Each structure stands twice: as C-alpha cells, then as structure tokens.
Amino acid sequence: MSSLTLSRRPRRNRKTAAIRDLLAETHLSPKDLIAPFFVKYGNNIKEEIPSLPGVFRWSLDLLLKEIERLCTYGLRAVMLFPIIPDDLKDAYGSYSSNPKNILCHSIHEIKNAFPHLCLISDIALDPYTTHGHDGIFLNGEVLNDESVRIFGNIATLHAEMGADIVAPSDMMDGRIGYIRSKLDQSGYSKTSIMSYSVKYASCLYSPFRDALSSHVTSGDKKQYQMNPKNVLEALLESSLDEEEGADILMVKPAGLYLDVIYRIRQNTCLPLAAYQVSGEYAMILSAFQQGWLDKETLFHESLIAIKRAGADMIISYSAPFILELLHQGFEF
C-alpha cells in the first residue's frame, strides 16, 4: 500500500526520546521549585500530616537536616509556615509579632545555616488567631486596614530575621503598598515581596488548615479571598499589587486555575509564582494510593502544566519528591 502524500508529518518530531527532548518547549528543573515546610516547637519531631501523606510537621533541628539533604538535590528555595500551640493564640494574632516565635527563630537559624538558600516567609494571621481568619475579626467582619498594619510589622520583623522574600497571603486591600513602605522605612529595601495577588476562596486548602490546626470558627473567607467564578478580578488584583510594589505575583491554587495563570502572564512582566496547594497534592496522592494513577508521572505532568501556562516558579508539597527524581535522572 502506497504512503499518503503529506507535506507535514508532525510525528517525525516525536519518533525518538532524544528528538522529543530536543524539541520540548517546557522543562522542569530544581530551580523552578519552592519547597514549603511546616515548623513547630520541640526537638526530634517529624510528624506526618494525615491528610497530606508524605508531608510533615518538623521541629527545627530535623528541618535543618532535611533542608541540608535536599540541597544536595538542588533545592534553592523554601517557604516556611508555623505551627502555633493553641495557648499562644488570641483573637488578634498577637504572637505573630513576637520576635521569639517559632517562625522568626526558624528564619534566623535556617538563613544562618544556608545563606545561599532563598528563604520565603508567610505573612498571615490565621496560624496565630483563635478564630482562624487571616486578619482581625470583629463583629462578623475581618477588618482590613487594622490587619494591614499588623502585616507591615510582621514583614519588617521577618526581614530583620533574614527572610529574603516576604509573602503576604491575606488578600487584604492595600497591604502590598503598606508592607513595601514599612520595609523601606525600616531599612529593608532589598527584601522582596511575593504577593498572593490572586488567592481564590477554594475548598482545596483543607489539608493545609489541618496541618496548621487552624480552622475558621465563625463565617468564612469569601469576603476577602476571591470568587472562583472570576478572572477579570484576578487581573485587577494582580495589577494593583504590581502598582503597589510587589516583586513577584502569585496565583493560588494552580491546577484548576491554569487559565488565570495564562491571563496574568500575558498582562505582566513581573515574575509569576503558582501554588500547587495541599488539596491538589492530596488528590494526586489519593489516586496513587488507590492504584489508579502513577505518582511520578502525574506530579511531573501537573507541574509541567503549571509552567506551560506561564508560571516561573511553583510552590508544591511534591517539591522534595520531585527534586529527588530529577537528581536521579528519572525519565518522565
């Protein structure tokens, strides 16, 4: 049987692994990944989170060893989240401004141990509040301006401790401009701001809240986090944060919002981060544990999709696992 007369045969560019690699448009490397870690008081603690298999709450001593191990695989950036005991929480999140809290102490110690590492700190109140909201909660409402002033103080404190980048995750109006001003006035003009500029009110955060032992006791976060139905609002939020002085923008969650990542990428020249959140990680792990899908290729494919949509960097709980695979030369 004679061959068809075709001027173009795209399959020629897929016929061997070498050709496919040569022509690949999107690549994943250790430099693309930010590893998030939960740190708590104590010693010799590595406590697996039930809703996040393979993710742990670490005491600082063991976290330092884990970071050292991952640096041999090419780890370049970490993001820290604190586990705060209930007896240190109050309605105002006062402990967030204590320079001796576990997050401040961890920033200082990790930066001293790994000065080459990019250290990103979480700027939020929900780990420290009894009500679980991301700001001061009064009479059924999260107070915007009063909360923003606290975030400015926290950001300055983290910069003093050694954070390279502060990452406000609260979604209050005007917080980027206020934090930038506070940092500059305090002598930290070199400290960058990674803004959670587009943070949707998603159901995919539940395992993260389990990890922090932080749950909303009254109301919800829909009055300040974004409506999943909207994308033009995402463009507005990101442009406002850019105008206010953000150095890096972020979309959270990532996997269900690839269109948003793409749209923002077309509208900004700033670096763009995406957060593959706890629920995304948990869904992939659940499918693997049920024997339905392959963990290695699914994590890789999900991260490639996020990069292909336009993200320059990805925060993912799979980062330690992927770093090991990349180091081993795993063929995806």
UniProtKB/Swiss-Prot annotation:
Q: Where does 5-aminolevulinate 2 bind?
A: 278, 317
Report the GO molecular function annotations: porphobilinogen synthase activity; zinc ion binding
Write the protein's name.
Delta-aminolevulinic acid dehydratase
Name the InterPro entries for this protein.
ALAD, ALAD_AS, Aldolase_TIM
State its role.
Answer: Catalyzes an early step in the biosynthesis of tetrapyrroles. Binds two molecules of 5-aminolevulinate per subunit, each at a distinct site, and catalyzes their condensation to form porphobilinogen.
Q: Where does Mg(2+) bind?
A: 237
One Gene Ontology cellular component term attached to this UniProt record is:
cytosol
Protein species of origin: Chlamydia pneumoniae
User: How the protein assembles, per its UniProt entry?
Assistant: Homooctamer.
Belongs to which family? Belongs to the ALAD family.
Residues that bind 5-aminolevulinate 1: 209, 221
Q: Which UniProt keywords apply?
A: Heme biosynthesis, Lyase, Magnesium, Metal-binding, Porphyrin biosynthesis
Q: Which residues form a coiled coil?
A: none
